[in-house]
Amino acid sequence: MNGRSYEVRTFGCQMNVHDSERLCGLLESAGYSPVDPGGEADVVVFNTCAVRENADNRLYGNLGQLVPVKKGHPGMQIAVGGCLAQKDRAAILDRAPWVDVVFGTHNLHRLPVLLERARHNAAAQVEIAEALEVFPSSLPTRRASHHSAWVSISVGCDNTCTFCIVPSLRGRERDRRPGDVLAEVEALVAEGALEITLLGQNVNSYGRSLGDPGAFAKLLAACGRVDGLERVRFTSPHPRDFTDDVIEAMATTSNVCHQLHMPLQSGSDTVLRRMRRSYRRDRFLGIVERVRAAMPDAAITTDIIVGFPGETEADFADTLDVVRAARFSGAFTFQYSPRPGTPAATMDAQVDRATVADRYTRLVALQDEISWAENRALVGRRVEVLVSEGEGRKDGATGRMSGRARDGRLVHFRADEAASSSTGSGPRAGGAAPAVAVAVAPTVRPGDVVETVVTRAAPHHLTADGPLRSHRATRAGDAWALGRDGDGGGAAAAQQPADGRPIVTLGIPSLRPSSPDPVGPASADAASAGADACCTPVRR
């Protein structure tokens, strides 16, 4: 240990969240330790997003708040990485000269060296690589959750959407070999993970660089053969590349969740053409129809941008029509904002802000109405919930706990009544496996699995205020308790050091004590969260 503490602050999408896990692993491998809650870190790292305009504002606002902190904290260092750093480079120092290190998306592994060099030379260090130097999955990683984990299957993107700057910042798509992906999945499950999310900018194009265009469906099926892996999710697919073999794999692989997040972006063929999205509304709705035919209980969510340059009222009406037809369980909705360096930023017919805001309000109102109706249909249904921490912001006040159903819906439930060990006979939602008689543990913990009955619905969540129908303690729950209390047990305990914090390993990463669950999309409006408009925002 070098005696210095660190904090990583993450803006943006799941890619950034997973990269931040790697930054934590790199720093801890270099001897840094996480700052204590409420403490003042010696090193603050910002992992930035460049997709939306307010991403810049959030970064520089946060950097400004650290000026007096740094003046009163001798030796403190500030580093800025991620997509905005890759884009703006040394210009960050022009706006925030108190920053010590700027690094990009292709050289995460250089952070500890750059911090040490900046300290030794007493001068800011800017190092931006033009291409990926080390595949990120080979880096040390400190996972954010004991029970859920991201697993990258590719990095970069070969699409050329006119509103998106990500390909120029993340590079062209590079795929991991299926054997490497499965080795990581198996290692995570051996440590107690119950759920993994396969991660890529466009998971449906996975395998092309390996000479196997059908590799993604095969990978899903292979995940179904991993003993102990209970839930498999993926994000994000692209409608252009979405094929029926993936639908079949989702429907026939028992641990693949019946949840699909598929970005629509617009329901107007004219706007989709200007966006260079390479599909049209009929193809999108055809995929939705085939998914629902194969999996009637599937929860389908999406991303939608309103106010794209040239969007007319008729174009917007087409989007509303698709939303009504698709009946999404939730949508991440965005007001278009031009990003320098993208073709859309210089297009004619930019839509005025008042019109964009009006359309956004109307879209959100329609989607909330649909989400609420879809959720009300689940009242009285039995759901299996993987318990998490940080999902329910009001859990402390309401006395509830929270987690995700198999279809990705957020469920707030009461855990203060004894769970029954009987199997029950009520209907189940989200494709949950039938309950079996279990020994009920006295305390429900993040990482455990419960079954409960939905008693109330809201547009963005379900509530279950009745007694639990079952509760299954898991090794992930044991590990959470160990990290919180310094005790615990089970096989998970054997993989923890004496202080209850999991180790950081190279290549096959380790899990981390409690932190907000990285599970993917559900009904929410994320426009104010500085989120990515082409990959699903993550809740923090």
Curated annotation (Swiss-Prot):
Keywords: 4Fe-4S, Cytoplasm, Iron, Iron-sulfur, Metal-binding, S-adenosyl-L-methionine, Transferase, tRNA processing. Pfam families: Radical_SAM, UPF0004. Residues 480-540 are annotated as: Disordered. Residues 376-468 form the TRAM domain. It is found in: Cytoplasm. [4Fe-4S] cluster 1 binds at C13, C49, C83. Residues 492-502, 520-533 have a biased composition (Low complexity). Coiled coil: none annotated. Residues 143-374 form the Radical SAM core domain. Residues 4-120 form the MTTase N-terminal domain. [4Fe-4S] cluster 2 binds at C157, C161, C164. It is an enzyme of class 2 (transferase). GO terms for cellular component: cytosol. The keyword 4Fe-4S applies. It catalyses: N(6)-dimethylallyladenosine(37) in tRNA + (sulfur carrier)-SH + AH2 + 2 S-adenosyl-L-methionine = 2-methylsulfanyl-N(6)-dimethylallyladenosine(37) in tRNA + (sulfur carrier)-H + 5'-deoxyadenosine + L-methionine + A + S-adenosyl-L-homocysteine + 2 H(+). Its EC number is 2.8.4.3. CDD domains: Radical_SAM. InterPro entries: Elp3/MiaA/NifB-like_rSAM (IPR006638), Methylthiotransferase (IPR005839), Methylthiotransferase_CS (IPR020612), Methylthiotransferase_N (IPR013848), Methylthiotransferase_N_sf (IPR038135), MiaB_methiolase (IPR006463), rSAM (IPR007197), rSAM_horseshoe (IPR023404). Catalyzes the methylthiolation of N6-(dimethylallyl)adenosine (i(6)A), leading to the formation of 2-methylthio-N6-(dimethylallyl)adenosine (ms(2)i(6)A) at position 37 in tRNAs that read codons beginning with uridine. Monomer. This is tRNA-2-methylthio-N(6)-dimethylallyladenosine synthase. It comes from Frankia casuarinae (strain DSM 45818 / CECT 9043 / HFP020203 / CcI3). The lineage of its organism: Bacteria, Bacillati, Actinomycetota, Actinomycetes, Frankiales. The gene is miaB.
